[in-house]
From Swiss-Prot:
Organism annotation: Borrelia turicatae (strain 91E135)
Gene that encodes it: rpsH
Record-level GO BP terms: translation
Keywords of the record: Ribonucleoprotein, Ribosomal protein, RNA-binding, rRNA-binding
Name of the molecule in the record: Small ribosomal subunit protein uS8
Biological role stated in the UniProt entry: One of the primary rRNA binding proteins, it binds directly to 16S rRNA central domain where it helps coordinate assembly of the platform of the 30S subunit.
Length: 132
């Protein structure tokens, strides 16, 4: 079956791998997936990621981050926008995730950025997902 929402598929794979405490997870390569992983790495939710080819198709191997007791860094990761329901927000109405402890990932005219960066740059955009 074809994947129609690559971001949603990526978020589900990360959520499932994190819950069963896998060391890493393989994801389909796309520019938006790579941008989201850049933010997750910058914020400390994943350790690193590598891009590799398998039979001519590009994939990303994301290495998940855990604490000393093997508790995942990602407690919850949820898609906000879907292909059938896009959710947009101005920088003034940008929601806070877990009272500021989580992050919001936004696709804006400045690229894929966090909700805090969107507020600081005074740009709105499509709300992709929330992580905490």
């Amino acid at each position: 079956m074809a994947v129609t929402h690559s971001v949603g598929d990526m978020l589900t794979k990360i959520r499932n791998a994190s819950r069963v405490k896998h060391e890493s997870v393989d994801l389909k390569m796309s520019k938006i997936n790579k941008s989201i992983l850049d933010i997750l790495k910058e914020e400390g939710y994943i350790k690193n990621y590598n891009i590799f080819d398998k039979k001519g198709i590009s994939f990303i191997k994301a290495i998940l981050n855990y604490d000393n007791k093997r508790n995942p860094a990602i407690n919850r990761i949820d898609a906000i926008s879907t292909p059938g329901r896009k959710v947009y927000s101005s920088y003034k109405n940008m929601p806070r995730i877990k009272n500021g402890y989580g992050i919001l990932i936004v696709s804006s005219s400045k690229g894929v950025i966090t909700g805090k960066q969107a507020k600081d740059n005074k740009v709105g955009g499509e709300l992709i997902c929330s992580v905490w």
